[in-house]
């Protein structure tokens, strides 16, 4: 929005041309989203407390979690609001990818909001029934997949890029739609499963989102893309502003969500942020790198799949409790130790993801 205004004002003073620089707008984006989260955060917490929108805690989980009962939840709405405002202010609203990611985030946020509302306000422990949640996730995921497929202008935009190998791009054809669907919906649910401890999901989301912003910047610059042997996707660089806003909003939320948390993001936040990460990874053609950098999300998801499969087949559980962060808690790890160690793992995996740019 402001980019269009400054473009007009630059006719009268050259100072305003500075806002054409993507890097500056990304910095302003992260600062704006951070400021909104920090300034509005306390007010949101007070409002949620007044409305008695508090977290319900499982009685069969770690006993240390019982004290979390009643902690305000649905704070993901604050993250979405901060990202949206910052992106609309500093992003190029003529860019299709900005709108795709924004709309996917908002759509999945609505699904999460309905689920949270039914659980917390209507006191329905099931929330939104799983089949309906998956149905709407599928609708929105497929809508994004079809749009990206039919608006792709080059074959590289729908090919699977294999990291660590030079010039290995697998043409996907219509299978691109299937892959995109699973990446978006899968990442959305993976972040949701990870969001079980104070700050556990939000910092890895910030780290992976920030890294994807760097990939978006490189993919959107034809010189960098050519040098690094990654596909050039015209316009994808503008997603750096969105990723910067995500990082700022996430860090601002972490201020209140760090142990002991004053607020939880709820499904409205985790489903939306996960879907946004998946969509960005698809646009910049780094689905496999997302799998690496988001290793914590993958680990949490796989632990649930293995636990359910093992119990159905053998009536025995592999882990004391799934997702796996609860397993470590029940083994005696203090909650902050689990959280920080998972953060450290994510930092290492993000660095591995960056290394794939040069190791080929």
Curated annotation (Swiss-Prot):
- Gene Ontology MF annotations: metal ion binding; phospho-N-acetylmuramoyl-pentapeptide-transferase activity; UDP-N-acetylmuramoyl-L-alanyl-D-glutamyl-meso-2,6-diaminopimelyl-D-alanyl-D-alanine:undecaprenyl-phosphate transferase activity
Cofactor(s) named in the record: Mg(2+)
Annotated Gene Ontology cellular component terms:
plasma membrane
* Biological processes, Gene Ontology terms: cell division; cell wall organization; peptidoglycan biosynthetic process; regulation of cell shape
Q: Which PROSITE patterns did the record assign?
A: MRAY_1, MRAY_2
From the UniProt record, give the pathway where this protein acts: Cell wall biogenesis; peptidoglycan biosynthesis
Subcellular localization: Cell inner membrane
Q: What is its main location?
A: membrane
Q: What are the EC numbers?
A: 2.7.8.13
Q: Which cysteines are joined by disulfide bonds?
A: none
Q: Which reaction does it catalyse?
A: UDP-N-acetyl-alpha-D-muramoyl-L-alanyl-gamma-D-glutamyl-meso-2,6-diaminopimeloyl-D-alanyl-D-alanine + di-trans,octa-cis-undecaprenyl phosphate = di-trans,octa-cis-undecaprenyl diphospho-N-acetyl-alpha-D-muramoyl-L-alanyl-D-glutamyl-meso-2,6-diaminopimeloyl-D-alanyl-D-alanine + UMP
Entry keywords, A to Z: Cell cycle, Cell division, Cell inner membrane, Cell membrane, Cell shape, Cell wall biogenesis/degradation, Magnesium, Membrane, Metal-binding, Peptidoglycan synthesis, Transferase, Transmembrane, Transmembrane helix
Q: Topology versus the membrane, per the UniProt entry?
A: Multi-pass membrane protein
**Family annotation (InterPro entries):** Glycosyl_transferase_4, PNAcMuramoyl-5peptid_Trfase, PNAcMuramoyl-5peptid_Trfase_CS
| Spans through the membrane | 27-47, 73-93, 97-117, 145-165, 168-188, 199-219, 236-256, 263-283, 288-308, 337-357
**NCBIfam families in alphabetical order:** mraY
What does the UniProt record say this protein does?
Catalyzes the initial step of the lipid cycle reactions in the biosynthesis of the cell wall peptidoglycan: transfers peptidoglycan precursor phospho-MurNAc-pentapeptide from UDP-MurNAc-pentapeptide onto the lipid carrier undecaprenyl phosphate, yielding undecaprenyl-pyrophosphoryl-MurNAc-pentapeptide, known as lipid I.
Which PANTHER family does this entry report, sorted A to Z?
Answer: PHOSPHO-N-ACETYLMURAMOYL-PENTAPEPTIDE-TRANSFERASE, PHOSPHO-N-ACETYLMURAMOYL-PENTAPEPTIDE-TRANSFERASE HOMOLOG
Family to which the UniProt record says this protein belongs = Belongs to the glycosyltransferase 4 family. MraY subfamily.
Q: What is this protein called?
A: Phospho-N-acetylmuramoyl-pentapeptide-transferase
